Amino acid sequence: MGIKETLLSFMKEEAYRPMDIQELVSVFDISPDEYKVFKKTLKIMELEGSIVRTNKDKFAVPERLGLIKGRIQSHKKGFGFLIPEEDGERDVFIPSSFINGAMNNDRVIVQITRDDVNGKKREGEVIEILERANTKIIGVYEDSRNFGFVVPEDTRLNQDIFISKKDKNGANHGDIVIAEVTKWPDKRRSPEGVIK
């Protein structure tokens, strides 16, 4: 069993409580020579979403912290659903105010904010985007005086892509174009891109 599998198995044990890197080094008896590789392994596992780091710099598997990994299925009105990776796990409704810059089909980690109550579906909030699904977006270029934007053809991508004048690369109003996303959206900002 490799170090990743050993760490995952350990963190999934019922008695496991989130630990920081020094505690894990002590438990696994990691030598100074092995430390760099061990730390890098934790970072890779975190990027993959198999473990998460709490705000106190402790590591745990997402499920033990009430977190769920999956893909976002967006609706043109701005809300979405998390389609969980874990078999048997039910979908989670994500209100538009809790989508936090995630776009359709992005792989994310969601924190449950409300469980099933009185027939209402459980709800969650995107707390981390693990992998972006839409790096190039097809849409209609719309020009304005100081900038332009691309309105995606896929209505599930419900945010226009801002295009600066220098990045329009000869596109004219009404052209069907491909925009490559250069800055991802967040709560307060639309995605930015360049016309290819």
Predicted regions and their residues:
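Charge-lined substrate channels and their catalytic hotspots, especially those that engage the 3′ end
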Residues: 1-196
